[in-house]
Swiss-Prot record:
Transmembrane segments: 496-516, 521-541
UniProt-recorded name of the protein: Probable protein kinase UbiB
Gene: ubiB
Disulfide bonds: none
Subcellular location: Cell inner membrane
Statement: the UniProt record of this protein carries the keyword Glycosyltransferase: no
Binding site for ATP: 129-137, 152
Similarity comment text for this entry: Belongs to the ABC1 family. UbiB subfamily.
Pfam families: ABC1
Keyword Iron among UniProt keywords: no
Entry membrane topology: Multi-pass membrane protein
Organism: Aeromonas salmonicida (strain A449)
Keywords from the named record: ATP-binding, Cell inner membrane, Cell membrane, Kinase, Membrane, Nucleotide-binding, Transferase, Transmembrane, Transmembrane helix, Ubiquinone biosynthesis
Length: 546
């Protein structure tokens, strides 16, 4: 560890102790090295002892800086790991970072694009439109067509800072995992590694550009979601150029109402967008918090969502989608047996899981929830309770489902802020049932045939030759197998004879030794020993023969 890293580690420990984070672990569970280290830092006193544990954790993350703030934001979505009071506090973390100077942004853009800013853009504004811990956004116009754009640029020299903090976070996670056995349920090493992958992905803006292009293509012509156009010819690893949009932040409800927005339809559109992404496209925006969603000023009676910042996306394979849709339908029909069976069939829980016990555990957790009217039930919290129950039965971590549950909580929370009477189940059920019908009905079979038709048309001329070759190889393999079986039987017979001869030889040896001790039977003893030697010699030859 370098002196600079050691200084940073001391700073982290100081902040954690001043916020009393060490007291969150009961003394009886604290390992002796931890207690000793705490006593050795006796001059560090807790600053705000009256605050709740969630507030103290939030303040610690805020004091540790932007990388830890983003980590806290990520943790706030892992409600399968954290108590609700801590998760709610961490959700209040704001990525407030002073902008870096516009001249530095200009130099970074020119370094990435390999030419002066004025060559490509007009009206480049060095005053940032927005600033965050990883990047900041400037505005301008494309020189070739005059279109308004935003230019997102990664902060200069941010990578070494992130790498250093990540190394320290990994060190702390390993120490916690080693010395605090009760932390196993929180899986600190795994959580930090997940965060590491997420934040390193955010440093590559070409990935975000590709995600935005995919999402825009999926919703071309849609009246539910609009994704700004990306100008790929001007995008690089540290620079993203895309269309500038104008809209009302989705969380600004007074502005939406003043614009005459149909709030009920807007809330339902959010649900439609989410389930369309998941079940039609298998590709969903996984960071749909209010800061990334706007509503178009145009057509307030037919509101259009606008999505930005596609740095984090999720994907589902066909099997995940099928099991997920069946799970939704099963637990809203209170068919807990089917929910348990689906978890086993999907491989989300081990195959030796006792379905009866799993069903009982699910029923115990979900049945009280479903005593409420469906319109009052939180879809996201049902999923959360289901995953927490499954985790007790050794459910493997499913990153795609964690992202899905986080996004669903965002969408549901937004929907009910916009229209408190939103019945998420009634809005979502048609999408689920329609998707299931398309996957398992006659239409699905016909679509599968059509999808595979070109492949079989290409392979059809080769079919007779393939059949002949298969039959020839089968006949050859049968002859080879028969020969191997005959050789095996011969070998087994020889081995049996060898064991028999060795056994007889051992018996004759014992008899011979006994007779040699009797003076009147020495000749018979010699004959027995000779017989034993002969039997062993024959047995040895039999055993060596193949």
């Amino acid at each position: 560890m370098t002196p600079k890293e050691f200084k940073r580690l001391y700073r982290i420990i100081t902040i954690l102790l001043e916020q009393g984070i060490d007291e969150l672990v009961p003394a009886r569970y604290q390992p002796w090295p931890g207690r000793l280290a705490r006593r050795s830092l006796f001059w560090l006193k807790k600053k705000q002892p009256d605050l709740s544990r969630g507030a103290r954790i939030r303040l610690a993350f805020e004091a540790l800086g932007p990388i830890f703030i983003k980590f806290g934001q990520m943790l706030s979505t892992r409600r399968d790991l954290l108590p609700p009071d801590i998760a709610e506090e961490l959700a209040m973390l704001q990525d407030r970072v002073p902008p870096f100077c516009g001249q530095a942004a200009r130099l970074k853009i020119e370094e990435s694009l390999g030419c002066p800013v004025e060559t490509l853009f007009d009206d480049f504004d060095e005053t940032p439109l927005a600033s965050a811990s990883i990047a900041q956004v400037h505005t301008g116009r494309l020189k070739e067509n005059g279109r308004e754009i935003v230019i997102k640029v990664i902060r200069p020299d941010i990578e070494p800072v992130i790498e250093a903090d990540l190394r320290l976070m990994q060190t702390l996670a390993r120490l916690v995992a080693r010395f605090v056995p009760q932390s196993a349920r929180l899986r600190p090493i795994e959580v930090v590694e997940e965060y590491r992958k997420t934040i390193l992905d955010e440093l590559n803006l070409m990935r975000e550009a590709a995600n935005a292009i995919q999402l825009r293509r999926n919703f071309t012509g849609s009246d539910a979601l609009y994704v700004p156009e990306v100008f790929t010819e001007h995008c690089r690893e540290h620079v993203l150029v895309m269309e500038r949009i104008y809209g009302i932040p989705v969380s600004d409800i007074p502005a939406l109402e003043a614009n005459g927005t149909n709030m009920k339809l807007l809330a339902e559109r959010g649900v439609e967008v989410f389930f369309t992404q998941v079940f039609r496209d298998s590709f969903f925006h996984a960071d749909m918090h209010p800061g990334n969603i706007f509503v178009s000023y145009e057509h307030p009676d037919n509101p259009l969502w606008i999505g930005i910042d596609c740095g984090i996306v999720g994907t589902l394979n066909r099997e995940d989608k099928r099991y997920l849709a069946e799970n939704f339908l099963a637990f809203f029909n209170r068919d807990y047996r089917r929910v348990a069976e689906l978890h086993v069939e999907s491989g989300w829980v081990p195959p030796d899981t006792k379905v009866d016990e799993f069903e009982f555990a699910i029923r115990t957790v979900l049945e009280p929830i479903f005593e409420k009217p469906l319109s009052e039930i939180s879809f996201g919290h049902v999923l959360l309770n289901l995953f927490n129950t499954a985790r007790r039965f050794n459910m493997a971590v499913q990153p795609q489902l964690v992202l899905l549950q986080k996004t669903l909580l965002y969408v549901e929370g937004l929907g009910r802020q916009l229209y408190p009477q939103l019945d998420l189940w009634q809005t979502a059920k048609p999408y689920l049932e329609n998707w299931m019908h398309e996957q398992v009905g006659p239409k699905a079979v016909w679509n599968a045939i059509k999808e595979k038709a070109p492949f079989w048309a290409e392979k059809l001329p080769e079919l007779p030759e393939l059949v002949y070759e298969t039959l020839r190889q089968t006949r050859h393999q049968q002859r080879h197998f028969d020969q191997m079986f005959a050789d095996f039987r011969r070998h087994s017979r020889r081995q049996g004879q060898a064991r028999y001869l060795l056994g007889v030889g051992a018996s004759l040896l014992l008899v011979g030794v006994f007779l040699l001790t009797q003076k009147q039977h020495i000749e018979w003893g010699q004959i027995s020993l000779a017989g034993a030697g002969l039997c062993w010699l024959l047995g040895w030859f039999k055993a060596r023969s193949h």
